[in-house]
Amino acid sequence: MSYQIITDSCCDFTKAQLQQYDVTCANLTVLYNGENHSNFSEPAAVKAFYNELRSGTMATTAAANPDEWAQRMRAALEKDRDVLVLAFTSALSTTYQSAVIAAADLREQYPLRKIIVVDTLCAALGQGLLLHYACKKRDEGMEIEELAAWLEEHKSHVCHWVTVDDLSHLKRGGRISTTTALVGTMLNVKPIIHVDDEGRLINCAKVRGRKSAMEYLVKKFQETCTDFDTVFIAHGDCPEDAATLEAMLREKHGIKEVVTGYVGPVIGAHTGPGVLVVFFMGSKR
């Protein structure tokens, strides 16, 4: 095709997946132990990151800046290719706005090229799932403007249902109080979080125990899923729980493909180890 799809590393695709989909990627970064780390979800590196969190290491995150975006865009523009950007939700990061700034500058330098930036309103492998569909449409021959319109129409149907195992990280991020974290831990309370239509993380329920939390995720899948061809599952270094969740989903539905990966460091820094997420296309978020 005559255009290049570019995303950012919050999509949590591995380098191999990015190559498979022919997508280039702007990097967000995570700071811990005094060093900046790019947010690529290579399994060994992400597992090491979660082990750092378990040992008490604090991590902070930084958005992809305009220069990072411009570098990726310019590489395509110099090959006379248009650019379609799928960016991490603007509700959680300035990464999208940085892409908009970079695109505005480059349009002046490359007036004959199209540069379209989409705020996915998605995060982690939810962003990855939307990217999966975008690449499929591209490969089927959809032109850049038509694909951008398709993304705007369908992005609010990418469902993200999350359960967090360790409340201490939500406490550190200010999403729950110290008292709530303490009582919740004592009572084995597991919060349920989802990404709403504005791309925000919303606390929406509390259940007792990990099994009940996974059953809640399956319930939301049953209520709203509209496409059983492809489902993504992500985890914070708890592959056994991810496999259990997949089995629970497959028990009730004829899902063709389940893609499992890590919740990368940008989101994982805030949710901690043990986070578990299911992503799918649904009738509503």
Description of each model-found segment:
Residues 3, 81-85, 231:
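Generic beta-sheet signal
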Residues 54-85, 89-92, 97-102, 148:
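Glycine-rich phosphate- or other oxyanion-binding loops that anchor nucleotides, phosphorylated ligands
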Residues 87, 116-117:
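A glycine-rich beta-strand to alpha-helix segment
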